[in-house]
């Protein structure tokens, strides 16, 4: 693997405060959070693939709203069929047991159906993928023509080398220098693979933060806040360059 499977370090972090701007709706039987850009355009869009807390985590909705404020329609589906890791999980929660019910055979159909609705119902012409932690794997899996045009992932998990080797679009990676699930040897492996592909790529590394920083860092810590904000800016800049047309 070019990044390791989710583990107990995925279920920590801080809750953030703020008023969300989007709306909860459904694509068929899939709950989705949708946030529109100021001009309500659906031409340039982002499929937001969350971490293991799914739609229940306000942090993710606030980030989705920020992408929308920068000119993108954002759609965040419930990847877990109503079974995310509880935000208020007990210390004994076993993430690996939970993960067995949320592997590609369960998640791929949700991503495929959401992309279809984005293109057919909403009229999206260009779609980028944002993936945090768990969601990063599926940005990589779907970075192909007719699916996702551009990808941005932060502290990704569970990505197989063959999945990364197969991408056909620009990919930007935001990483922590202290991430046990995406350690230096896995970053270097990923860089070696990407260097052999004919696609634009980027890997930014942030010190002083841990796995999950781009979504669940402690905003009261100056360096954590800076890393989170810079990671978000990295994603926006990447999409502005490679997605918007």
Curated annotation (Swiss-Prot):
Pfam families tied to this protein: DLH (PF01738)
Pathway as given in its UniProt record: Secondary metabolite biosynthesis
Active-site residue list: 133, 179, 211
GO molecular function, one term: hydrolase activity
SUPFAM superfamilies: alpha/beta-Hydrolases (SSF53474)
InterPro entries found in the cross-reference section: AB_hydrolase_fold, Dienelactn_hydro
Keywords: Hydrolase
Purpose of the protein: Initially, the PKS portion of pyvA synthesizes C-10 carbon chain from 5 molecules of malonyl-CoA, which is then condensed with the thiolation (T) domain-bound glycine activated by the adenylation (A) domain. The subsequent chain release by Dieckmann condensation (DKC) could be catalyzed by the TE domain present at the C-terminus of pyvA and/or the alpha/beta hydrolase pyvD, installing the tetramic acid moiety.
Stated family: Belongs to the dienelactone hydrolase family.
Name recorded for this polypeptide: Hydrolase pyvD
Annotated organism of origin: Aspergillus violaceofuscus (strain CBS 115571)
Lineage of the species this protein comes from: Eukaryota, Fungi, Dikarya, Ascomycota, Pezizomycotina
């Amino acid at each position: 693997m070019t990044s390791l499977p989710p583990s107990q370090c995925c279920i920590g972090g801080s809750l953030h405060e703020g008023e969300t701007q989007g709306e909860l709706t459904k694509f068929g039987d899939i709950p989705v959070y949708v946030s529109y850009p100021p001009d309500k355009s659906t031409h340039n869009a982002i499929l937001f693939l969350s971490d293991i807390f799914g739609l229940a985590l306000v942090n993710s909705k606030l980030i989705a709203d920020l992408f929308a404020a920068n000119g993108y329609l954002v759609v965040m589906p419930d990847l877990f069929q109503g079974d995310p890791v509880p935000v208020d999980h007990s210390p004994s929660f076993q993430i690996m047991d939970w993960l067995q019910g949320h592997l590609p055979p369960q998640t791929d159909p949700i991503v495929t159906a959401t992309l279809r609705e984005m293109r057919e119902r909403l009229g999206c012409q260009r779609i980028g993928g944002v993936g945090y932690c768990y969601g990063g794997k599926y940005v990589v899996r779907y970075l192909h023509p007719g699916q996702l045009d551009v990808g941005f992932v932060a502290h990704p998990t569970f990505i197989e080398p063959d999945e990364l080797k197969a991408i056909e679009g620009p990919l930007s990676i935001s990483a922590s220098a202290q991430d046990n699930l995406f350690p230096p040897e896995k970053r270097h492996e990923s860089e070696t693979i990407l260097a052999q592909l004919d696609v634009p790529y980027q890997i930014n590394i942030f010190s002083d933060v841990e796995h999950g920083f781009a979504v669940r860092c402690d905003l009261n810590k100056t360096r954590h806040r800076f890393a989170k904000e810079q990671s978000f800016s990295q994603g926006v800049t990447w999409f502005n360059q490679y997605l918007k047309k």
